């Protein structure tokens, strides 16, 4: 560009005047920034420390299939093509929008532009394609959730086209978790077990497996910068130590905590306890195998009438509400099915009376220690009838897992925590050994859906069918608990057992302690 030399004197004066004005503005802006940077109460310097009960052993989510790795790193260090909100609804992630073809075989995602990884490399559609291909090649945990991929391509820098051999109505859901993480294709040789190269609002500042994970704000993040400078997770294996650390100020927050811990800390000065929704479902599971009493439809239904599921839900401190079916309130296809089997001991007694004394004798209720109390309640409720009696066995986790695998049980108390996990009842080889032709067809129909509306409607029909047939007794959905200092804000409260986005977590500087050591 050429510059005119006319009115050169005025140009010089204009230049000096402009410099003076600019310097003055910089002084004002700098003074304001310094005040905001250092004044007590500013979030810019806040360090928030969070207590958790499990820590990943590796930062590589592809090789560490633990829930902890995904919960702490996704949305914080790594970003996914699609994400979910606090109501478990799909929301734009790295992909600002997507479109599914009418036949359900092509999904086109449009990516944000101007995104970089924490190492400065540009993130574009080629990285997304490479990441998806790596998931398949390396058989990453849950890779089957991607469905039958025919091809993955990037026609340009901001477009990803996924072609399927057959419809997968939950593909976008899969892309909101570990399978949807976009990695840097130019850093394929990096040691991801100890190093994280993501595009999220935080970077990993330090990682001590089994002890701590420190996240630092990424100043190059493409979105709204994290509210806190540092977020550090500390592992506590003892609930009493965790509670003490919260009350003495060694921790600013703990999530998720048990119902008993939340109850014990409720009302403590300087702390607040919040509840949130989950997809965690607690059920009295039935062994429907041919050698089990529960292979008989009449027996299954009698147990459902006999068990006071609503009463159990109202009494359990971690219960958000009675359930009645395999799909929770936050999952596609939910319907309130609690009215199918209202508590009716007279009805149960009549149904049990059809069985001879030598057939209806004793059922084995096998549980791990965590469900001892609930199992004792269930045993008492069943034994209000003359038959059957209940042989309750509380086992170690190892022995329990073996008994379930060997199929030597009739009843057990367990939880299922996953969106779209109801399909397990369509698998006759699952632990439930539930073999129902109509249910299998209903689930296959749902999986063949080419749009969300059809999928939800068909899942609702499937859920009603297996609940009416009493494949198990779904007791209640769980709620989760967060305990935090009253000086901390902006943290999530729902779904925190699955993911914990912390870009908005904020604390008042001067109220949150600067720490070099932690009470264990």
For each feature predicted by the language model, list its residue ranges.
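Long beta-strand-rich cores associated with HINT superfamily self-processing modules
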Residues: 482-520
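N-terminal lobe/hinge region of extracytoplasmic solute-binding protein
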Residues: 51-102, 133, 197
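Surface-exposed binding/hinge segments that line
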Residues: 144-185, 206
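Gly/Pro-rich hinge or "lid" segments in bacterial periplasmic/extracellular proteins
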Residues: 68, 173-225, 230, 240, ...
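Structural transition elements
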Residues: 318-355, 372-373
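Periplasmic-binding protein-like
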Residues: 290-331, 374, 466-471
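Ligand-site clamp/hinge motif
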Residues: 219-264
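Extracytoplasmic/peripheral linker and loop segments enriched in polar/acidic and small residues
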Residues: 2-3, 7, 18-22, 35, ...
């Amino acid at each position: 560009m050429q510059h005119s030399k006319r009115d050169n004197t005025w140009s010089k004066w204009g230049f000096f005047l402009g410099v003076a004005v600019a310097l003055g503005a910089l002084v004002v802006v700098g003074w304001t920034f310094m005040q905001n940077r250092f004044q007590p109460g500013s979030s810019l310097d806040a360090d928030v420390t969070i207590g958790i009960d499990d820590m990943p052993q590796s930062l590589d989510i592809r090789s560490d299939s633990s829930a902890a790795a995904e919960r702490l790193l996704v949305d914080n260090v790594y970003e996914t093509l699609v994400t979910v909100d606090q109501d478990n609804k799909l929301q734009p992630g790295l992909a600002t929008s997507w479109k599914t073809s009418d036949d359900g075989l092509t999904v086109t995602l449009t990516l944000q532009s101007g995104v970089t990884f924490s190492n400065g490399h540009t993130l574009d559609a080629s990285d997304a394609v490479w990441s998806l291909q790596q998931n398949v090649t390396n058989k990453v945990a849950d890779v089957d959730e991607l469905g039958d991929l025919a091809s993955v391509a990037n026609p340009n820098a901001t477009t990803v086209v996924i072609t399927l051999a057959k419809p997968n109505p939950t593909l976008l859901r899969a892309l909101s978790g570990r399978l949807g993480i976009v990695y840097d294709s130019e850093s394929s040789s990096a040691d991801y077990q100890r190093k994280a190269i993501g595009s999220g609002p935080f970077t990993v500042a330090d990682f001590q497996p089994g002890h701590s994970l420190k996240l630092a704000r990424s100043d190059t993040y493409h979105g709204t910068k994290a509210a806190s400078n540092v977020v550090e997770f500390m592992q506590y294996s003892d609930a009493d130590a965790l509670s003490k650390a919260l009350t003495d100020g060694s921790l600013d927050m703990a999530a998720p905590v048990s119902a008993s811990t939340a109850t014990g800390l409720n009302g403590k000065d300087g702390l607040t306890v919040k509840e949130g929704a989950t997809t965690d479902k607690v059920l009295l599971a039935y062994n429907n195998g041919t050698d089990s009493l529960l292979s008989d439809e009449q027996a299954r239904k009698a147990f459902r009438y006999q068990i006071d599921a609503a009463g159990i839900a109202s009494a359990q401190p971690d219960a958000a509400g009675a359930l009645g079916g395999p799909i929770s309130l936050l999952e596609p296809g939910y319907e309130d099915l609690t009215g199918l089997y209202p508590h009716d001991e007279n009805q149960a007694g009549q149904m049990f009376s059809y069985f001879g004394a030598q057939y209806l004798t004793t059922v084995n209720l096998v549980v791990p220690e965590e469900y001892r109390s609930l199992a004792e309640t269930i045993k008492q409720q069943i034994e209000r009838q003359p038959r059957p009696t209940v042989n309750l066995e509380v086992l170690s986790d190892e022995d329990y897992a073996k008994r379930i695998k060997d199929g030597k049980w009739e009843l057990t108390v367990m939880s299922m925590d996953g969106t779209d996990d109801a399909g397990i009842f369509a698998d006759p080889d699952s632990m439930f050994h539930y073999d129902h032709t109509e249910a299998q067809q209903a689930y296959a129909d749902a999986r063949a859906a080419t749009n969300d509306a059809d999928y939800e409607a068909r899942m609702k029909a499937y859920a009603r069918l297996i609940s009416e047939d009493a494949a198990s007794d779904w007791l209640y959905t769980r709620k989760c608990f967060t305990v935090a200092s009253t000086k901390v804000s902006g943290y999530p409260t729902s779904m925190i057992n699955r993911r914990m986005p912390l870009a908005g977590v904020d604390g008042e500087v001067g109220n949150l302690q600067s720490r070099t050591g932690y009470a264990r």
